[in-house]
Amino acid sequence: MSFAPLQNDTFLRACRRQATDYTPLWLMRQAGRYLPEYKATRAKAGSFMGLATNVEYATEVTLQPLERFPLDAAILFSDILTVPDAMGLGLSFAEGEGPRFAKAVRDEADVAALAVPDLDKLRYVFDAVTSIRRALNGRVPLIGFSGSPWTLACYMVEGKGSDDYRLVKTLMYSRPDLMHRILAVNADAVAAYLNAQIDAGAQAVMVFDSWGGVLADGCFQDFSLEYTRRVLAQLKRTGVDGQDVPRIVFTKGGGIWLDDMKDIDCEVLGLDWTAHLGKARAIVGGQVGGPGKALQGNIDPNVLFAPSAQIVTQVRAVLDSFGTPHTDKTTTGPTHIFNLGHGISQFTPPEHVAALVEAVHGYSRSLRQR
C-alpha cells in the first residue's frame, strides 16, 4: 500500500518532540455538527451510523474542516463505540439522544460472553482510513483513534451515556473481578482495532479516555491507566510507509495524575483545560536532548463562543502557559500540539474557529522568532 508523500509533517514532528516553525493544531471533533457542510452530508446519509459506515461519506466529512481551515492533521471520522458494537451490543443513535446499546453488560453471563470482535465487522472503518489517506494526498497526516478500555466499559455497562456512572461503578466496587475481565477484553480489542487502522494507513493513533477523570484516585490507576498501558504495549510501532506511528493518550480530568502517566509508553499526552501546560511540561515534557512527552491541548472549547479578540487573547494565554518552544532542530525537546481541552461544541460559529487557527499559527511563529 503506497500513499503520496507528506507535505506538512509539522504535527508528526511535534509528536516526536522535534522543533517546528510554529505550533501545529487540530481540533477534537473538527469534522462535526458545527459545520453546515457536515450537516448536509449527514442528511444525505440519513443517520450518524449511516455516515460513519459509508466510506465515501466518512471520507467527505473528514476532509471538510481542512477545506475551511489550515489544520495540521486530519482525524478519522468515526465513533469510539464502534468496538462494542462489533462485540454484538447493538449500537444506535436516537436523534438528539446520543448513543445507546440494545444490550448492556452487567452480570456474570454478559461478561463471560464478551470477546475481542471479528475485525471484519469493522472493515468499514479500515476502508475509510485508507480512503481518507488517499484523498488527503499527502496534505497532512491522518490520526486514527479508539476509546480507552475504561471509557468503552462505561458505555457497555451503563448501556448509554451517564451523569453519575452509578451502574459501572457499582460493578467495579462490588465485583472488581468482572470489571477487570471486561477491561482486559476491551484492551485487547482496542489494540487490535488500532493496529488495523495503522495497517490501513493511519499515521498516528489516539486513545480517548474520556471518562477516566470520573474515577477515584487509586481506581484510576487500577481500572483505567493499567488497561491503557495494556493497549499501548500491543501497538505496532511502524506504519505502512515505514515511519514510526506516534501514540497519543488523552484522559479528560487526568491532569491530576500526570505523575502516574509520565512513564506510560506513548509519545503524546493530551490535557483538558483544567491543567496548566507549563506545570505539565515540568512533570512530563522533559528537557532539550532528553526523554519526555509532547503535550496536546488544551483551550476550553467554550472560548470559541467569545468574540474574536477574546479568542486571540485566550489562545496566546495557552501558548504562553506552555512556555518558550524548543527550536533546536538538531535534537529533541519539549513540544506542544495545540488543541481544545475536549470536543468542539456543535453550536460553535465556524468563523470563530478560523480566528483560533489564525491566532495559533501566527502567535506561535512569533514566539519562535524572539
Swiss-Prot record:
One Pfam family, short name: URO-D
Site feature location: Transition state stabilizer: D79
Swiss-Prot/TrEMBL keywords: Cytoplasm, Decarboxylase, Lyase, Porphyrin biosynthesis
Record: residues binding substrate: R29, Q30, A31, G32, R33, D79, Y155, S210, H342
One Gene Ontology term of the molecular function aspect: uroporphyrinogen decarboxylase activity
InterPro entries the record matches: UROD/MetE-like_sf, Uroporphyrinogen_deCO2ase_HemE, Uroporphyrinogen_deCOase
Biological pathway: Porphyrin-containing compound metabolism; protoporphyrin-IX biosynthesis; coproporphyrinogen-III from 5-aminolevulinate: step 4/4
Catalytic activity of the protein: uroporphyrinogen III + 4 H(+) = coproporphyrinogen III + 4 CO2
GO CC list: cytosol
Keyword match Acetylation: no
Any Gene Ontology biological process: protoporphyrinogen IX biosynthetic process from glutamate
Keyword Transmembrane helix included in the entry's annotation: no
Protein EC: 4.1.1.37
Record's subcellular location: Cytoplasm
Enzyme class: lyase
Xref: HAMAP family: URO_D
Task of the protein: Catalyzes the decarboxylation of four acetate groups of uroporphyrinogen-III to yield coproporphyrinogen-III.
Family, per entry: Belongs to the uroporphyrinogen decarboxylase family.
Assembly, per entry: Homodimer.
Protein name (database record): Uroporphyrinogen decarboxylase
